[in-house]
Every structure is written in C-alpha cells, then in structure tokens.
Amino acid sequence: HVKSIESWLATAGELPLQVKLLIEGEEEVGSEHLEAFLKDNAEQLACDCVVISDTSQFAPGVPAITYGLRGIAYFELKLLGPKQDLHSGVFGGGVANPANAMAKMFGALVDADGRVTIPGFYDDVADLTERERAEFAALPFDEEGFKSQLGVEHLAGEKGFSTIERRWARPTLDINGLTSGYQGAGAKTVLPAKATAKLSCRLVPNQDPHKVAAGLKKRLEEFLPPGIRMKLVEHHGAPGIVMPLDSPYLQAAAVAVEKGFERRPVFIREGGSIPIVNKFASVLNADVLLLGWGQNDDNPHSPNEKFSLDDYHRGIRASAALWQELAAIKKNG
C-alpha cells in the first residue's frame, strides 16, 4: 500500500482520496493497546473504509477477497488433585487422578458427529446462505491434494458440511496442548498431582466468547469428580465477523484486484481470527476490506518465510487501482 501511494504521488501528484496510514506492531501479542488508541483518536482516524492486508490468496494465481473471519475464545484449564505426585501402586484406586479426569472431560466435549457438546454452543450460530455454499463448492479446492499437503489420510469434522465450510464458517473446539505427570525417559508410575491444558473454540458470527466460556465451564463441571479442583482461565477472545457481499467497498476492491492480478478474485472466508478487524469496525463504524497478496505456502512465522516478488508487484498494482475505485464510490455517493 505504501508503494502504491508513492506511485500515485510520483505520477499524479496527489491521491484521488484521503488515505490515513496506521502502522501497528503489536498484532502478534494481541494488539493490547490498539482499541484504546482507536477510541482516543477516533476523530482523527474517522473513515468510510479500513483496508487490512493480513490474509492470503485462495491458491496460486487465484486472488481472493476475504469477507469473513472466525472469532476465538481461548482458555487454560487446570485440574488439581493431591498436593504432590503420588505412587500409583500405593495410592492408585484410592485418590482421584487429575489426568484421568481431564481425559474424561475432553472425551465428552465433541460427539461422534463432530459437534461440540457445550450447552447453547450452537444457539447463536449464523448459518451459511445458499449463495455462500454454492460459491464455496465452486472454488478450485483439491481435497486429495489438501490431505497430501498435510500428511493425513482422512479429514475430520462436523458431519453435514464440506471441508471448506467446516474450516471457514462452522464453530469448533480444539485441545491446543496438555500435560500431566511424568514425561521423561523410561517409566515412573506416578499418580499426578495436576493436569493442565490449553484449549480454544473458533467461533462464527453472532457467537459471544463470554457466553461460550460460561457454557464450557458448566460442561466441564458435569465431569468433575470429587477430590479434584478445577480452575478455568478465560484468556483472549473475539467474535467472528462477516461483511456483506453486496458492500460497494467489497465490489470496488474486486475491480481493483482484477486490475492488479488480471483475474477476477474469489470471495472467501477464513478460519483464523484477526481480532483487530472487530475493533476497527466497531470503534470507527467503518467497513473493513481484507486484501491479502500472499500464498498459503509462504510459511508465515517460520524461519524460511517468503513472499513472491510477482505477488508483491501485483499487489502494488491492485492497491493503486483500489484508491481510484474507492474514490469513485465517494464521488458517486
């Protein structure tokens, strides 16, 4: 975007509309101070549309505009039993085992059909429209290639939905990490004093992270045996978001991306979460465009992270066209 602005200034002397740049470096640590900054500077940052580039193309040569993201609710669970690890031969059968209790809890959180069993979990879920399901089905998605890329033989998830629908637009619950007892080499037959785990729910529009947290606590307590204490800590959370497909800003972006990439973009949703999107939309009362130029195999956060120079140049052209297309909306509106 910066390069496209430089190009406009170098060739035309000015931009066709007012552009405000916000460079924020806390995204990887939760953007803790962003919301307060937006509120404190709302008048200076007032705008009709926010452009964020933190997404990707759908596939090589298939540019995409992301119009929806899942939200997230993230938790840490601790189950506490005896004051110290015990000998399972001496005490096993007489003292509740936190690891056993956690295994039973987790086994009950998702049923055989892949549905989350938290009370009220699906009450507020915004269902996909028939248009969305048809457009997702028409995308050039190679399921066998997807499995090969991941190194798995079978895919899993909620019954009644395609792989893309499950990844982009259905809520989930996943265990992100767990530990208990002895993890070293050889055998050590302990009855562990505690078990800890990290878990998260990916949410879709209309689901409230705090309501999900309350439901999760209630569900876990159903399987809490006597002699075990439970601590459930609710960490960061954010609701899902979806932008209307008929938004004039979305349609203007489609024209601009086509000019930059010489191919009409597809409209997609993504399964990840970008909490700042909700903050921009709510605090500034603005539409949000998610335009990403990278590829799914760019290995973000990895030591060998990359970005194609061809995509870089196409992105500059698309961004330059975007300012013109957005200016036309303002002029005609």
Regions found by a protein language model. Give the residues of each.
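Alpha-helical metal-binding/catalytic segments enriched in His/Glu/Asp
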Residues: 1-30, 75-79, 92-112, 199, ...
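Acidic/histidine-rich catalytic neighborhood of metal-dependent amide-processing enzymes
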Residues: 2-68, 330-333
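Short beta-strand/turn micro-motifs at beta-sheet edges
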Residues: 63-67, 184-189
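Acidic-enriched catalytic cores of C-N bond-cleaving enzymes acting on peptides and small amides
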Residues: 67, 74, 88-178, 207-229
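Zn-dependent metallopeptidase/amidohydrolase metal-coordination segment
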Residues: 78-80, 102, 169, 187, ...
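C-terminal catalytic subdomain
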Residues: 104, 185-215
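Short glycine/threonine-rich loop-to-helix capping motif typified by GTGT followed
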Residues: 128-136, 240-249, 278-283
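A short beta-alpha structural unit
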Residues: 202-205, 231-246
